[in-house]
C-alpha cells in the first residue's frame, strides 16, 4: 500500500513551542502526537524548512530539533526543478516575489507528490486564492493536486 505523503512547512514545526498562541500550539502538539502514531503517513520536510528553523534562537531551536527527532520524516533537498516550478507560480501571480520561499515550499510538496501541505501560514498558504491558483497551474502542467490545511483541520483523520 502506498503511503500518504504530508509536507510540513516551517510554521507547523515552529508552533510546537509558541506560547503567545496557545491554541495553535496545542493543536500543533496534538497533530504531532497523531503523526507519531501513523505509520501509514510519510512526513516530508525540506532542507528549506531546516534552514528556516535554524534561525530560531535557543532554547526554542533545541526544543524543535528534539521534537523532530521523535518522528519519522524524510528531508528532501530543494532541486532546480522545484525552483523552476516556484518561478512558474511566481510568474503566474500566485504570490509576490518576496514570498518566493513560500512558493518553493509548495513546489517541493507538489513535485514530491504530497497529498497535503500543513501550515499555519494563512496569508500565503492556507487561503482559497493560493490553493486555487496552485492547483490550476498544477493541472495545466499535469502535476498532482495538493490540499493545504492548517493543523486544526488535520486533527482526527486524514
Can you name each region flagged by the protein language model?
Residues 73-131, 155:
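Active-site neighborhoods of divalent-metal-dependent phosphate/nucleic-acid chemistry enzymes
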Residues 63-67, 74-77, 148-150:
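Extended, non-globular alpha-helical segments
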Amino acid at each position: 500500500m502506498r503511503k500518504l505523503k504530508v509536507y510540513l512547512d516551517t510554521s507547523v514545526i515552529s508552533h510546537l513551542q509558541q506560547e503567545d498562541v496557545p491554541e495553535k500550539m496545542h493543536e500543533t502538539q496534538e497533530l504531532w502526537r497523531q503523526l507519531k502514531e501513523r505509520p501509514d503517513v510519510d512526513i516530508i520536510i525540506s532542507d528549506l524548512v531546516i534552514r528556516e528553523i535554524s534561525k530560531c534562537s535557543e532554547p526554542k531551536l533545541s526544543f524543535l530539533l528534539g521534537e523532530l527527532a521523535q518522528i519519522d520524516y524524510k528531508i528532501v533537498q530543494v532541486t532546480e526543478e522545484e525552483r523552476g516550478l516556484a518561478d512558474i507560480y511566481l510568474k503566474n501571480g500566485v504570490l509576490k516575489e518576496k514570498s518566493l520561499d513560500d512558493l518553493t515550499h509548495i513546489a517541493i510538496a507538489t513535485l514530491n507528490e504530497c497529498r497535503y501541505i500543513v501550515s499555519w501560514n494563512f496569508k500565503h498558504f492556507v487561503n482559497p486564492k493560493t490553493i486555487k491558483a496552485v492547483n490550476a497551474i498544477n493541472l495545466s502542467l499535469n502535476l498532482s493536486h495538493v490540499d493545504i490545511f492548517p493543523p486544526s483541520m488535520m486533527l482526527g483523520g486524514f
